[in-house]
């Protein structure tokens, strides 16, 4: 029963995070697909249909500062590969999205490459190679301060991923627009590859796929609201990770009799 308290709390955090993410996606749809808060204003024609006056149709490149390629480096220090880094793989993306810091592999890259490839708070990492017949490439996650702190601000993505640095004011808008496109299957139409590994034509997607772009002040207001959801998801993820580690530490000691349940103050753990 004591161990199940850990599992129950971890599961509760997972469900809360799932709900928070759904709320953020619903808010995005309300604002930028259905235009609910703006229906009393004037609308104009565009190539994507009627949009609020003052908005425009553009592409992802209009709200992206730059993109970064990945680096896989070496398994151990070798020659000029001396900079220790942690690499985000496509397989790590689902965990990072849930707020789980995961276990990224350690690699060693050339120091000057790290200066240009190091990930920062607010960056997005996109999986550009992989996928399956039913799962598109293009899965994405955001880089948080908590993730950077855990890995000593030494994170890059692998060369099977690509990092995007959004314009700061559009970072949340870009992320949820990307998520909506991914869930709609749009990334399938930008894939190529005949060797069994699919590759995402990320440059084509960024430069060609038309999107609606709201004014900066609206993008900032959306960011302000969804940042609350995002920070709570990250906080819950950190808590669940700590609970998981503590559970795995206590369980063998409890089973061996080294520690009794009465020795553990569950009030301090589950407060």
Which residues make up each language-model segment?
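Non-catalytic DNA-recognition/assembly elements of restriction-modification systems
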Residues: 1-33, 38-72, 212, 216-262
């Amino acid at each position: 029963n004591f161990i199940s308290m850990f599992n129950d709390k971890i599961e509760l955090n997972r469900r809360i995070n799932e709900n928070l993410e759904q709320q953020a996606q619903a808010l995005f749809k309300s604002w930028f697909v259905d235009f609910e808060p703006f229906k009393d204003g004037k609308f104009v024609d565009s190539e994507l249909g009627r949009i609020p006056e003052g908005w425009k149709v553009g592409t992802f490149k209009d709200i992206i500062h730059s993109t970064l390629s990945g680096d896989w480096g070496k398994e151990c220090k070798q020659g000029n590969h001396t900079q220790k880094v942690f690499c985000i793989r496509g397989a790590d993306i689902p965990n990072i999205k849930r707020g789980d810091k995961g276990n990224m592999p350690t690699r060693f890259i050339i120091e000057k490459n790290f200066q240009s490839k190091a990930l920062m708070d607010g960056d997005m990492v996109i999986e550009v190679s992989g996928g399956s017949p039913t799962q598109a490439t293009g899965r994405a996650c955001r880089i948080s301060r908590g993730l950077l702190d855990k890995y000593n601000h030494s994170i890059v993505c692998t060369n099977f991923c690509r990092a995007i640095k959004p314009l700061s004011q559009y970072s949340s808008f870009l992320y949820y627009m990307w998520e909506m496109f991914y869930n709609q299957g749009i990334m399938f139409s930008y894939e190529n590859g005949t060797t069994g590994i699919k590759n995402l034509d990320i440059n084509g997607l960024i430069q060609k796929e038309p999107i609606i772009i709201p004014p900066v002040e609206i993008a900032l207001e959306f960011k302000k609201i969804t940042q609350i959801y995002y920070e709570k998801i990250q906080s819950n993820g950190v808590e669940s990770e700590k609970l998981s580690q503590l559970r795995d530490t206590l369980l063998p000691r409890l089973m061996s009799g080294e520690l009794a349940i009465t020795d553990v103050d569950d009030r301090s753990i589950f407060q």
